[in-house]
Swiss-Prot record:
Motif extent (Histidine triad motif): 96-100
Pfam family, one: HIT
Native source species: Mycobacterium tuberculosis (strain CDC 1551 / Oshkosh)
Record GO biological process: nucleotide metabolic process
SUPFAM superfamilies recorded: HIT-like (SSF54197)
Gene3D superfamilies given in the database record: HIT-like
Protein name: Uncharacterized HIT-like protein MT1300
PANTHER family: ADENOSINE 5'-MONOPHOSPHORAMIDASE HNT1, HIT FAMILY PROTEIN 1
MF term (GO), any: catalytic activity
Domain named HIT: residues: 4-111
Protein backbone atom coordinates (compact mmCIF):
# COMPACT_ATOMS: atom_id res chain seq x y z
CA UNK A 1 0.00 0.00 0.00
CA UNK A 2 1.40 3.45 -0.88
CA UNK A 3 2.34 5.81 1.94
CA UNK A 4 -0.38 8.41 2.57
CA UNK A 5 2.18 10.90 3.92
CA UNK A 6 4.30 10.53 0.77
CA UNK A 7 1.14 11.22 -1.26
CA UNK A 8 0.42 14.34 0.82
CA UNK A 9 4.02 15.53 0.44
CA UNK A 10 3.78 15.01 -3.34
CA UNK A 11 0.53 17.00 -3.46
CA UNK A 12 -1.46 13.92 -4.50
CA UNK A 13 -3.59 13.81 -1.34
CA UNK A 14 -5.24 16.70 0.52
CA UNK A 15 -3.99 18.16 3.79
CA UNK A 16 -4.00 21.47 5.58
CA UNK A 17 -0.39 22.59 5.34
CA UNK A 18 1.01 24.59 8.24
CA UNK A 19 4.70 24.75 7.39
CA UNK A 20 6.91 23.60 4.54
CA UNK A 21 10.55 23.85 3.60
CA UNK A 22 12.87 21.81 1.38
CA UNK A 23 13.01 18.83 3.72
CA UNK A 24 9.87 18.91 5.87
CA UNK A 25 6.13 19.43 5.81
CA UNK A 26 3.84 20.13 8.78
CA UNK A 27 0.12 19.41 8.42
CA UNK A 28 -2.93 19.39 10.67
CA UNK A 29 -3.80 15.89 11.88
CA UNK A 30 -6.98 14.61 10.22
CA UNK A 31 -8.09 13.10 13.58
CA UNK A 32 -6.87 15.68 16.10
CA UNK A 33 -6.71 15.07 19.83
CA UNK A 34 -6.59 18.85 20.38
CA UNK A 35 -7.24 21.91 18.22
CA UNK A 36 -4.04 22.57 16.30
CA UNK A 37 -2.76 18.95 16.54
CA UNK A 38 -0.01 19.05 13.93
CA UNK A 39 2.18 16.37 12.33
CA UNK A 40 5.73 17.20 11.25
CA UNK A 41 6.82 14.94 8.37
CA UNK A 42 10.23 14.56 6.78
CA UNK A 43 9.85 14.62 3.00
CA UNK A 44 12.30 11.73 2.74
CA UNK A 45 10.41 8.54 3.59
CA UNK A 46 11.68 6.66 6.62
CA UNK A 47 9.57 4.26 8.64
CA UNK A 48 10.59 4.74 12.26
CA UNK A 49 13.40 5.78 14.59
CA UNK A 50 15.64 2.91 13.48
CA UNK A 51 16.05 4.24 9.94
CA UNK A 52 15.68 7.99 10.49
CA UNK A 53 18.93 9.99 10.69
CA UNK A 54 19.46 11.84 13.99
CA UNK A 55 19.70 15.13 12.09
CA UNK A 56 16.20 14.61 10.68
CA UNK A 57 14.82 13.99 14.16
CA UNK A 58 16.51 17.16 15.44
CA UNK A 59 15.03 19.15 12.55
CA UNK A 60 11.56 17.71 13.24
CA UNK A 61 11.79 18.72 16.91
CA UNK A 62 12.97 22.23 15.99
CA UNK A 63 9.99 22.64 13.63
CA UNK A 64 7.68 21.22 16.32
CA UNK A 65 9.04 23.77 18.78
CA UNK A 66 8.24 26.60 16.36
CA UNK A 67 4.70 25.30 15.91
CA UNK A 68 4.30 25.02 19.69
CA UNK A 69 5.41 28.65 20.08
CA UNK A 70 2.95 29.69 17.38
CA UNK A 71 0.09 27.83 19.07
CA UNK A 72 0.84 29.50 22.41
CA UNK A 73 1.19 32.93 20.81
CA UNK A 74 -2.29 32.61 19.29
CA UNK A 75 -3.88 31.26 22.48
CA UNK A 76 -4.63 27.89 20.84
CA UNK A 77 -2.54 26.30 23.59
CA UNK A 78 -1.46 26.68 27.19
CA UNK A 79 1.14 23.89 26.93
CA UNK A 80 2.52 21.37 24.43
CA UNK A 81 2.86 17.62 24.06
CA UNK A 82 5.50 16.51 21.54
CA UNK A 83 5.69 12.81 20.68
CA UNK A 84 6.78 10.25 18.13
CA UNK A 85 4.84 6.98 18.12
CA UNK A 86 7.60 4.54 17.13
CA UNK A 87 6.19 1.21 15.99
CA UNK A 88 2.87 -0.60 16.07
CA UNK A 89 3.08 -1.26 19.84
CA UNK A 90 3.46 2.51 20.36
CA UNK A 91 0.29 3.16 18.31
CA UNK A 92 2.08 4.21 15.12
CA UNK A 93 -0.52 3.78 12.38
CA UNK A 94 1.18 5.48 9.43
CA UNK A 95 4.61 3.99 8.85
CA UNK A 96 6.33 7.19 7.76
CA UNK A 97 8.08 8.68 10.78
CA UNK A 98 6.33 11.82 12.06
CA UNK A 99 6.29 14.08 15.09
CA UNK A 100 3.02 14.93 16.84
CA UNK A 101 2.64 18.46 18.22
CA UNK A 102 -0.43 18.51 20.47
CA UNK A 103 -1.26 21.95 21.90
CA UNK A 104 -3.66 21.45 24.85
CA UNK A 105 -5.54 24.18 26.67
CA UNK A 106 -6.11 24.31 30.39
CA UNK A 107 -9.07 22.08 31.12
CA UNK A 108 -8.51 19.68 28.22
CA UNK A 109 -8.81 16.08 29.31
CA UNK A 110 -5.73 14.73 27.58
CA UNK A 111 -3.83 12.05 29.47
CA UNK A 112 -1.45 9.51 28.00
CA UNK A 113 -1.90 7.35 31.09
CA UNK A 114 -5.70 7.25 30.86
CA UNK A 115 -6.14 7.37 27.10
CA UNK A 116 -6.75 10.32 24.85
CA UNK A 117 -10.04 11.98 24.20
CA UNK A 118 -10.76 12.70 20.55
CA UNK A 119 -11.71 16.32 19.92
CA UNK A 120 -13.00 17.65 16.63
CA UNK A 121 -11.59 20.94 15.43
CA UNK A 122 -14.60 23.16 14.68
CA UNK A 123 -12.79 24.91 11.81
CA UNK A 124 -9.65 23.21 10.52
CA UNK A 125 -9.13 25.81 7.78
CA UNK A 126 -9.20 28.65 10.33
CA UNK A 127 -6.84 26.75 12.64
CA UNK A 128 -4.43 26.24 9.75
CA UNK A 129 -4.58 29.93 8.85
CA UNK A 130 -4.01 30.99 12.49
CA UNK A 131 -0.91 28.80 12.82
CA UNK A 132 0.52 29.83 9.42
CA UNK A 133 0.09 33.52 10.32
CA UNK A 134 1.75 33.01 13.71
CA UNK A 135 4.71 31.25 12.06
CA UNK A 136 5.02 34.13 9.56
CA UNK A 137 5.06 36.61 12.46
CA UNK A 138 7.84 34.60 14.13
CA UNK A 139 9.85 34.67 10.90
CA UNK A 140 9.35 38.43 10.53
CA UNK A 141 10.38 39.05 14.15
CA UNK A 142 13.51 36.91 13.71
CA UNK A 143 14.58 39.03 10.72
CA UNK A 144 14.28 42.31 12.67
Amino acid sequence: MPCVFCAIIAGEAPAIRIYEDGGYLAILDIRPFTRGHTLVLPKRHTVDLTDTPPEALADMVAIGQRIARAARATKLADATHIAINDGRAAFQTVFHVHLHVLPPRNGDKLSVAKGMMLRRDPDREATGRILREALAQQDAAAQD
